[in-house]
């Protein structure tokens, strides 16, 4: 019905993905390294806090490549594993 709206979002999504690929390339980050870092970061944070949906991204900001982590903390206390 509103295909023109969908196309606009697809264009923006494609642009965002291209910017991300270029940032990875400029920072010389090997494939899979960001995913491994994301998993490690979330594992450490989840030891101390319950978390919701999170995102870890790399962005190009001028001459710098920036790692952005958005990790919302849930209200419920974390489940501690007994040793």
Curated annotation (Swiss-Prot):
<dbReference type="InterPro" id="IPR036707">
    <property type="entry name" value="MinE_sf"/>
</dbReference>
<dbReference type="GO" id="GO:0032955">
    <property type="term" value="P:regulation of division septum assembly"/>
</dbReference>
<comment type="function">
    <text>Prevents the cell division inhibition by proteins MinC and MinD at internal division sites while permitting inhibition at polar sites. This ensures cell division at the proper site by restricting the formation of a division septum at the midpoint of the long axis of the cell.</text>
</comment>
<keyword id="KW-0132">Cell division</keyword>
<keyword id="KW-0131">Cell cycle</keyword>
<comment type="similarity">
    <text>Belongs to the MinE family.</text>
</comment>
<protein>
    <recommendedName>
        <fullName>Cell division topological specificity factor</fullName>
    </recommendedName>
</protein>
<dbReference type="InterPro" id="IPR005527">
    <property type="entry name" value="MinE"/>
</dbReference>
<dbReference type="GO" id="GO:0051301">
    <property type="term" value="P:cell division"/>
</dbReference>
<dbReference type="Pfam" id="PF03776">
    <property type="entry name" value="MinE"/>
</dbReference>
């Amino acid at each position: 019905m509103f295909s023109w709206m969908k196309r606009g979002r697809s264009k923006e999504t494609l642009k965002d993905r291209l910017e991300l690929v270029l940032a990875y390339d400029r920072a010389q980050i090997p494939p899979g390294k960001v995913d491994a870092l994301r998993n490690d970061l979330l594992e450490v944070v989840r030891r101390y806090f319950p978390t919701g949906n999170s995102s870890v991204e790399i962005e190009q900001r001028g001459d710098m490549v920036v790692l952005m982590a958005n990790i919302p903390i849930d209200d419920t206390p974390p489940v501690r594993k007994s040793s």
